Each structure stands twice: as C-alpha cells, then as structure tokens.
C-alpha cells in the first residue's frame, strides 16, 4: 500500500512538472510571437508609401559590386509619381533628411519679379531694331561671343521665367543648411553680364545661406574690369563680395583654385561668369550635401541665348554626363531606375564642369584640382573620377536650375600657352585615374599621346593612395555601366564612309564648307579619293546611326525643323539618335532622316549655288539619291538590330 502511494506521488509530481513545462513553453512562445508582431508593426511604420523600407544610414558611394540589388530608397513626401513596388523597377533615392523642413521661397521677391516690365524681363528675347546700331551690335558680338549690346539694355536685376517642374515649386527642404561661397572666375568678361550674374545670385539666394561671393579676375586686360569693378563692388557689395586678381592668366583651373583658397563657406558653388539662377535654386542643390558631405551636386543647366538673351529651358528629362575615348564630353540618358521621379536628384558619372557645388572640406580632402592641369580641359573628368572613386557621389538636381550663356562665334583669343595643353591635361588624368582604360584614349590619337610628357604625377597618385580609391574598372561597371556600349573602347567599323556624292549632280559631294558646328552643311566639288577624301568631305554613317565627320566626333548632321527645305545643320554629336538619326537605303540610295522614314537628304543647285536640305522622301527624285565612297553591306544588313 505504501509503495502504491509513493508511486502515485511520483506520478503526480511528473504530471505537475509536465504541466509547468507546457505552461512555460506556451508563455515563452506567446512572448516571442508578441515581440515579433511588435517588431513587424514597428517595421511597418518605417516603410514608405510604396511599401519599401527606409534606409536610416547612408554611406556615400557604398555601392554593392553588382547592379542586381536596388539602391536604398527613402521616403519622399513630395513625390509626383507612383514609384513602383519591390516587384518592379526600384528607384534610386537619398535617405530621408533628418530635421525640421522649411519652405525657402522668397514669395515677396517672386511677386516683385512678376510685376517687372522692360527689355528682357521674364527672359523674353530682345532685338536691336535701329539699323544705325547694327555695326555696334556686331562689334559687341565678336568681342564677347554673345550680344553685349543687348546685355547692356537689360537690367542687371531682370526677372526670369520659372522653369522648374511643378513638384519643385511646393517642395520643402531642411531648415538647417550649410552656408556657401559662390566663386565666379572670369577673363575679359562683359561688365554688365558679370554684374547680372552676381545680382542674380544675391536676389534669389537666402541671405542667411550666402556667406560670400568670390570674383577671380584671371588676368583680364579690359580696364572696365579693374578699378571700375573695384569701385562698384565697394559701393554695392562691400562686405559680401571678395575680388581676387591673378597678375597673369592662369586659366580656368588655376583661377578656381585661387578662388577656393579664399572661400570661407561650408560649401563652395563654382559658376561661370555669365549665368542667371532660377527661383529657389540653392536649397535643393545643397540639401544632398547636408545629408552627406561627400556628395557633390550640379544644377540643371538652362540656356540664355547668345543672340537675344532669351531665357529658356534645357533638357527637361535630364541627362547624365560622360565622355568618349577622345575625351570629349558627352551626355547619356538618365538610368531608368533614376528616372522614376523626374524631380528628384539622380546620379551622373561626370559633371559638365561649369556649374557645381561641393563641400569645402571634401574638396580639399580630395586634393582640390590637380594644380598642374593647365588653363582648361580635363578638370571635370579628374574631379568627377575622384568624387566617385574616393568615396563620394555626384548628383544632378532637377529642382535647382541655372541658366548659362553658351557663347557663339567670336574673335579667337589665341592659345595662351602655344602648345596642346588640353592633351597634356587629359594624359595626366588618364595616367592617374583611368588605369588600364587609358590605352583606349591613347589609341584614338597615338600621334598626340605617344611622346607627350604628362609631368610629375607623384602628388596626384599620392591622393589616390591616401584615400584608398576604387579602380577605374569599378567606375566603368558600377557608375557608368552603359558607357562601354555607347562608346566602345575599340572603334567599331562604319556602316558607310568616304565621300557622299549626289546622284543628280555627280560633280558635287557633301562638304563642311570649312565651317564647324552650328552651321549649315553644303556641297562642293568631289574629292578624287572616294574612300579616304580630305577631312571636309570625309563622312561616316557611324555605329551610333548618325552622319558624322570621320575623325571629328564633334560634328554630326542634325535637322531641327520639318519640311519643306529644312536646313541640315552641322551640330555637336550626342549619339542619341533623334534629330541625328540617319539610315542609308541601298535600294533607293536615299539618306533617310529619323526613325519614321519620312524625310530624306536632298541636294540641288540653284543659280549656280549648291544647297543641301531635308525634304519629304519622293520616289524618282534623283536629288535625294546619294552614293558613299564605301558601303559596309554586312553591317547595314543588321542596321536595325537592337533598336526598340
């Protein structure tokens, strides 16, 4: 009986113990589940409106070595488009800025601008109507590369059109932003145009952010830019504008270095001396730098006409900066993942170079500009490569817009050095930063580069070693993944090349007439050598499906307007098709313009003058028939392969 009682007690203890274990496990399980549910709830609160997680920490240029993973997104409360969810294309966006946000618009100043009237106000074109002033107008034009007489008639405080995207007009930015030094460099700049650049910045920049304006006179020869400029600055901007004068011309790069050395702002903004900023240009430009000081930014560049000072929009869709293997600056479309919201900053491999912002400390940590780069040329590549390869990032900012005068024809100013300083600059950049890819630059022009001394590169190589910068292969594959497709390192064969002879007028061939870009193409007596004629008649239907001068990637045939008799311009090559798309139809011998196949190149002789136009394609019109010196039939068989 006693044994039975002990057995029952042990059994009860086991049952109780089992129950305790079950209860404990249940309790622990419940706690774990509740904790996970709580974490899930917290995570849900950190998703943006599109269901994508917010990345709280941002490391500049900390890009995964494969492009498969999406870039870290951040919540944009002002987004104007529906960014696709994770099962679709993921957009690149910066992290959510921390801190109070503010509307930086100066609405009173904007309203005052709206009420202005007069010559050139609101960016309206101005014409000189008085025939007695035409000669003076011509002289101003030749001296400046733009219409200086019109510039003198326009107020230095003129109003501009608001060219921003609608989303930019209501967006708020961090209330706490770094202050800036704006650095203008100039050489023999038109006085009123320089003043308008200064006033433009002062009038449209929050005064609490504008620490300083630096004017660097790079050895100007004109008297008006000496004591009269000093007096004007002292009278109107005594505590804001600093003038630095180089005793002799150092060029763009040396002048910028001189300006950077006296800059006291937390961020430096470098500008050419013939610009006008748009409304609220600064906050969107420097907010990315406030988020991460290793980001450099560029505004969207609008245009001020060199002919009539009209102010109009540039590329509204934006473009990424790049280069070809002749080291010519090129532009490419924005990457699809960066173009989902056209109002947000996007990545660009190379800056245009004339307008950009950079944290002052970061600029000097990168070694500034290579001070052995002479005059101009290559500086935008050197700085862009350094920014990306040494831990930074370069962004273009659509909500920040600055208009620039792109000079027209003017009297040549001469080579200040008497040698090819641009090629030497390019070789310095290639030797330090481009690694094995430099050979593709040299092979494009071995005569220039083979025996060219790049100078002492010790300091620049030391910068790269000190900062432990990435390889150029990393840059080409991660930052500029489409460059090798758009600009093959090994020059591909042409679809057709040589002379382009008009069938109706066989003594005439397409000719640049000794002119360059922004001029109409013409016809002249055909060269004797059909496949390798003199440069002015050496054309190619290139791999980019454009008609360009062989060996001169800066000149392509471009048609701006529709028929009849549309002018065929020689224009800077952009390698993007569109107005520069051409196809050679071997059966009809037509050079067809555009992908819609409706316009053809036409040559004719009128009153003894040979002309070239684009007209609607017509069967049986021999004036629209052309013969190349050489046709690559194998390549033409696949001309449309790969086109969308």
Swiss-Prot record:
Residues 1-13 are cytoplasmic. Glycans are attached at residues 157, 179, 529, 565, 632. Keywords: Disulfide bond, Glycoprotein, Glycosyltransferase, Golgi apparatus, Lectin, Manganese, Membrane, Metal-binding, Signal-anchor, Transferase, Transmembrane, Transmembrane helix. Its cofactor is Mn(2+). One of its GO terms (biological process) is positive regulation of secretion. It comes from the Eukaryota. Residues 496-629 form the Ricin B-type lectin domain. Substrate binds at residues 218, 249, 273, 376, 407. It is found in: Golgi apparatus membrane. Glycopeptide transferase involved in O-linked oligosaccharide biosynthesis, which catalyzes the transfer of an N-acetyl-D-galactosamine residue to an already glycosylated peptide. In contrast to other proteins of the family, it does not act as a peptide transferase that transfers GalNAc onto serine or threonine residue on the protein receptor, but instead requires the prior addition of a GalNAc on a peptide before adding additional GalNAc moieties. Some peptide transferase activity is however not excluded, considering that its appropriate peptide substrate may remain unidentified. This is N-acetylgalactosaminyltransferase 4. It comes from Drosophila melanogaster (Fruit fly).
């Amino acid at each position: 009986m006693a044994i039975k009682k002990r057995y029952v007690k042990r059994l009860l203890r086991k049952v109780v113990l089992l129950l305790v274990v079950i209860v404990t496990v249940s309790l622990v399980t419940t706690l774990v589940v509740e904790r996970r549910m709580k974490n899930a709830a917290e995570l849900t609160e950190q998703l943006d409106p599109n269901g994508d997680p917010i990345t709280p920490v941002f490391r500049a240029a900390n890009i995964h070595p494969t492009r498969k993973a999406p870039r870290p997104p951040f919540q944009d409360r002002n987004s104007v488009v529906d960014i696709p969810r994770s099962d679709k294309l993921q957009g690149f966006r910066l992290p959510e800025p921390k801190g109070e946000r503010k509307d930086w618009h100066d609405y009173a100043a904007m309203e005052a601008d709206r009420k202005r009237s007069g010559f050139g106000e609101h960016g309206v074109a101005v014409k000189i109507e008085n025939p007695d002033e035409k000669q003076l107008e011509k002289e101003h034009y030749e001296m400046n590369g733009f219409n200086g007489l019109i510039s003198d008639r326009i107020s230095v405080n003129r109003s501009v059109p608001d060219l921003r995207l609608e989303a930019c007009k209501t967006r708020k930015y961090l209330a706490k932003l770094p202050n800036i030094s704006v650095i203008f460099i100039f050489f023999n700049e038109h006085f009123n145009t320089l003043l308008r650049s200064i006033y433009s910045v002062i009038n449209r920049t929050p005064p609490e952010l504008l620490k300083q304006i630096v004017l660097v006179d790079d050895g100007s020869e004109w008297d008006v830019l000496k004591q009269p400029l000093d007096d004007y600055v002292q009278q109107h901007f005594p505590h804001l504008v600093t003038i630095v004068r180089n005793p002799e011309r150092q060029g763009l790069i040396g002048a910028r270095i001189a300006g950077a050395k006296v800059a006291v702002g937390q961020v430096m903004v470098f500008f050419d001396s013939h610009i006008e900023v748009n409304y609220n240009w600064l906050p969107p430009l420097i907010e990315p730098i406030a988020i991460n000081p290793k980001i450099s930014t560029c505004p969207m560049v609008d245009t001020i006409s060199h002919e009539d000072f009209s102010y109009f929009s540039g590329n509204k869709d934006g473009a990424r900066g790049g280069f070809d293997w002749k080291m010519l600056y090129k532009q490419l479309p924005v990457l699809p993942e960066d173009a989902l919201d056209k109002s947000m900053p996007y990545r660009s491999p190379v800056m245009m170079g004339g307008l950009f912002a950079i944290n002052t400390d970061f600029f000097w940590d990168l070694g500034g500009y290579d001070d052995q780069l002479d005059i101009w040329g290559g500086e935008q590549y050197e700085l862009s490569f350094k920014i990306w390869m040494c831990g930074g990032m370069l962004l273009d900012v659509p909500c920040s817009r600055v208009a620039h005068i792109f000079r027209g024809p003017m009297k040549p100013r001469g080579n200040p050095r008497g040698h090819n300083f641009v090629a030497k600059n390019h070789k310095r950049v290639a030797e330090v930063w481009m690694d094995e890819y430099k050979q593709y630059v040299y092979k494009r022009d071995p005569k220039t580069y083979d025996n060219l001394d790049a100078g002492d590169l010790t300091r620049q190589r030391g910068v790269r070693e000190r900062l432990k910068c990435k390889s150029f292969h990393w840059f080409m594959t991660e930052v500029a993944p489409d460059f090798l497709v758009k600009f093959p390192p090994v020059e591909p064969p042409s679809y057709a090349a040589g002379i382009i002879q008009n069938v109706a007028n066989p003594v005439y061939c397409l000719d640049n007439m000794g002119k360059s870009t922004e001029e109409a193409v013409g016809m002249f007596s055909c060269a004797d050598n059909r496949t390798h004629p003199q440069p002015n008649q050496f054309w190619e239907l290139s791999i980019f499906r454009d008609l360009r001068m062989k060996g001169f990637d800066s000149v392509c045939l471009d048609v701006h307007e529709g028929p009849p008799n549309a002018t065929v311009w020689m224009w800077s090559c952009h390698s993007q098709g569109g107005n520069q798309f051409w196809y050679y139809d071997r059966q009809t011998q037509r050079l067809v313009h555009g992908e819609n196949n409706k316009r053809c190149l036409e040559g004719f002789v009128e009153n003894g003058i040979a002309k070239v136009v684009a007209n609607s394609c017509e069967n049986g019109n021999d004036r629209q028939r052309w013969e190349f010196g050489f046709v690559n039939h194998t390549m033409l068989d696949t001309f449309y392969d790969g086109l969308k």
